[in-house]
Amino acid sequence: VFIPLDSCAEEFSEDAAAFGYCTACGKTHSLPYGSAQYYARTLLAELEAKGDMLLAVPEGVEGRQELQAQLDSLEGNPRYSMDYLWGKALGQMLGVMVCKKQDGTVGIVRAFSGQYDRIYDIPGWAPPVMNLPRYNAVNAAGSKVVNEYSDRIDSLAAHEKELLQQLKKERKACSRALMDELYALYILGNFKGEKKPLKEVFHSTQGMRTGTADCCAPKLIHYAQENRLIPLGIAEFFYGAENKSQTRQHGKFYEACEEKCQPILGFMLCGLDHNSE
């Protein structure tokens, strides 16, 4: 949801926060932090004070009453608690984008990476890139088939090696087909009005990782494109317990990740004309 601001913070950084190489035009495009770090720190403080992801909807937000009613109906549900990020989840990336409407109104949009305790969409936060109902339907149908293979494999005796190998091979093929079908639901756009499937956009010497296009930056940039907003700055920070690899710490800012974001952000930022090299 777009949250309008009365005025924009004076704090500003030209450092690139989100960037990537665009194979279509042969340039690296980037989006700076701008004033987004200020609003990210504000978000961090609000979450620490509230204790959950169900932040009150500020005045001036379109559809405020309906949105607030949705949040009120979820109040008290432990799945939205910030405690989740200090436990088994080992933290999560959150992001804020400063942007403006076509009429010049400046505001912010907030996002969380991936799922929050298996929840893809929380009122007040940027939705996922893919069509969520369609994604859930495809995933449920495909997972059912994969699970049926697993059940058959588990029921076989150890000496039935040839059949076991065949079923495992078929299960692996089904899993790959399901992932391909799910990836096909991710349609990415840029600021030239072009749209392409995720697999056509992604470029890297490494394979495409699970969760590509689910991080904060792609979510926020996609939301801006779908709602005709002009991004001015972006900031992503880590919330919660330090991750296992000790590369993320609570409250620290991090640029868009090299593995999943940079291979698609070049295309997504093409046409924005903040910085191109």
Regions found by a protein language model. Name each.
Residues 1-277:
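Catalytic cores of nucleic-acid editing and processing enzymes
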